[in-house]
Amino acid sequence: MPGTRGPRVAMLSVHTSPLDQPGTGDAGGMNVYVLELSRALARRGAEVEIFTRATSSAQPPVVDVQPGIRVLHVPAGPFEGLDKNDLPGQLCAFTAGVLRAEAHRSEGWYDVVHTHYWLSGQAGWLAAERWDVPLVHTMHTMARVKNAALAPGDVPEPQGRVIGEEQVVAASDALVASTREEAEDLVRLYGADLDRIHVVPPGVDLDTFTPPVPSDATARTALRERLGLPVDSPLILFAGRVQLLKGPDVLVQALEHLPEEVRLVVLGGASGRPTAVRELEALAHQCGVRDRVLVHPPVERRRLADWYRAADVVAVPSHNESFGLVAAEAQACGTPVVAAAVGGLRTVVLDDVNGVLVDGHDPLAWADVLGALLADDGRRARLAAGARAASRRFGWDEAAAAMLDVYAQATKRRPAR
C-alpha cells in the first residue's frame, strides 16, 4: 500500500446499501457498519468506493456521500422482487459491474477489497484475484451459527450459503471478527486460520448517541410528548427489524405478564416476510396486549437517539447477534439494556454492570427480569451510569485505525499465499 497516500478501498456490500434506512428489509446493523467505518476511514485519508446492487431505476449510478466516499449502484438482475436468497444467481453480473468500474481507472487503482457478508465475499474474491490485491472479509453473520440458534418457526440458512462461506473464509487474506467469540466460531465452525483473524469491535457514533441533556424527569416528559409516546408509562423499546431472529415476539408474550401500565414500543419494519408486522400485531391481540404495543416505522439515526433516551429499558431478545449495535447505541444514550445472553451481546452487555443478560427466550423469564428492573429506579440509574461508561469502549475512529492496520498486514502477507 503506498505510503504517500491513504489506501484506496473497494468496499462491497451486495445485498444491502449503506444508504438504505436501517430497520426495514435487509437493512440493519451492517448498513450502519459499512457507512460509519467508511466515514472513519475517510477521516484518516482513505478513499472508499462502496459497491452495492442497484434496487431501483431511480438510483443514480454514483452517489458522492462526502469527500473520500462514493457509493456505486451496480445493476445486477431485476431492480425489485429479488429475495436475498435469490442473489447468488446475480453474483456474476454484480462482479462484472465491479470489474468494469476498475477498468475505467488507471491500473492498480485499488489497494484492498473489503467485503461484507458472504455474497459480497464471493464477488470480492474474484475482484481481488483480478486486481492482485488482498481480500479482507467481515462475515457479520454465519450460517452455521444462525442455524444452531434458530427461533421457533424460522427457516434455516441453505447449504449453498454454508459452502459459499467456507470458500470465502479460505480465500481471504484477512478475516475481521467483531468479538473474540466470533473469532472462535470462525476457527471452530469454518476451519479459519487463527493468524488471519483480527478482532475489531464496531464503533458507535458517540457524537449522535449521547445521554439526554438535561436528564431530569421534566426533560423526559417533554421528549416523550414530542415523540408521541405515553408520558407516565414504563416504556420498553425494541429497535430493529421485525423478524423471528430478532425475537420481538418474546417481548409481546412477556408483556402479558407485566403490570398493566407497561408499554412496549416496536421501532422497525418487516424483514423477510412482508406480513411480519401484522403477524406481531396479531400475536399481541392474541395475548390481550394489543393496546399496550406501539408499532412505529424505523427512523433516521439522529432521531433514533431520542427514542433510546425516551425508553426506560431497551430490550434485545435476539436469538443471535454477531455484535449487537442496538445495545451499544442505547448504552451510549444512557439507557440500560436487557439482552439475550447470545453471541456478541455477551461482549456488549456486561451483566448487572451496564445491563442485564437473560438466558434463553422464555417469555416468563423475560417478564421477571424486565418487571424487576422497571420497578427498581435505583438499579436502573446505576445501570444507566454503567452503560454510559461502557459505551466509551466503542468508537469508529478506533475501529478505523485498527482496520487500516488489518489492511496493511493483509497486504504484507498476500505475496506469501
Curated annotation (Swiss-Prot):
It holds the Pfam family Glyco_trans_4_4. GO terms for biological process: mycothiol biosynthetic process. It comes from the Bacteria. Its EC number is 2.4.1.250. Transmembrane segments: none annotated. Belongs to the glycosyltransferase group 1 family. MshA subfamily. Catalyzes the transfer of a N-acetyl-glucosamine moiety to 1D-myo-inositol 3-phosphate to produce 1D-myo-inositol 2-acetamido-2-deoxy-glucopyranoside 3-phosphate in the mycothiol biosynthesis pathway. This is D-inositol 3-phosphate glycosyltransferase. It comes from Xylanimonas cellulosilytica (strain DSM 15894 / JCM 12276 / CECT 5975 / KCTC 9989 / LMG 20990 / NBRC 107835 / XIL07). The lineage of its organism: Bacteria, Bacillati, Actinomycetota, Actinomycetes, Micrococcales.
